[in-house]
């Protein structure tokens, strides 16, 4: 027990050290941006000279928090340089790569490597062997989604939705985590990405409802079981309600993942707002706290998105027994 306790303490220390190093690696880019920003504000003459290409190459947007979270066609590795992504145009449509697209590809590649690695490890295991390392972690997460999310909220027949729920959970989780790596970008901080994920949940939900109840049952749900005279009110309300769920999923994930990064950049930017490094220890300390909180938020938001998706699917496929069988209770007659 003492060995395990010391081992866990050692792992926590190493993890904390990596987080601090990652945060400090972001500082050169912010310091470099702040230095250029200060030179630009040195005087009107210097500002005019910079505007006409007189040698300074500052960008006032460098200290703008929004500039650091929006999508773009380049990766800014200040003070080392900028990597521009290739421009692609097909049939008059601009399908050029962006930071968030690249980060989604990286997230997908990481997931494939992890899943294939864990799968190969399970193939080599005997019945009496317990999974170790990454396989053990993945088993815990998969069982958590299966038992506490899918089975709890969908009930009977939850197994067929497991591939979808596991996919969105791990994809959102990996996108959230790699967004904390210095010089990277958070794809889930893009409302187009979160909207696409929410649309997939919407399509799965409605298709499952039609499959469970048929077209007639699906349309009857829009009336809310009310008197025909009330349909003029109930149908629009229920129809709008169909779209409020994916809208809530979209905005919730987008806002939470964007807010944390803006807070970190803003705290570090206070160093240059006050134009003194005396404020640096306070800013870095608060930024480090938010950075640690963002790790928790990365897991929490992936869980909430998956939980709400399972809840919406469960509500859509619930039968006339009101889900009693799904929750292990005998239906009343």
From Swiss-Prot:
GO terms for molecular function: proton-transporting ATP synthase activity, rotational mechanism. It is a multi-pass membrane protein. InterPro entries: ATP_synth_F0_asu, ATP_synth_F0_asu_AS, ATP_synth_F0_asu_bact/mt, F0_ATP_A_sf. Keywords: ATP synthesis, Cell inner membrane, Cell membrane, CF(0), Hydrogen ion transport, Ion transport, Membrane, Signal, Transmembrane, Transmembrane helix, Transport. Residues 1-32 form the signal peptide. The keyword Lyase does not apply. The chain crosses the membrane at residues 100-120, 161-181, 185-205, 229-249, 254-274, 279-299, 300-320. It is found in: Cell inner membrane. SUPFAM superfamilies: F1F0 ATP synthase subunit A (SSF81336). It comes from the Bacteria. Pfam families: ATP-synt_A (PF00119). One of its GO terms (cellular component) is plasma membrane. Belongs to the ATPase A chain family. Key component of the proton channel; it plays a direct role in the translocation of protons across the membrane. F-type ATPases have 2 components, CF(1) - the catalytic core - and CF(0) - the membrane proton channel. CF(1) has five subunits: alpha(3), beta(3), gamma(1), delta(1), epsilon(1). CF(0) has four main subunits: a, b, b' and c. This is ATP synthase subunit a. The gene is atpB.
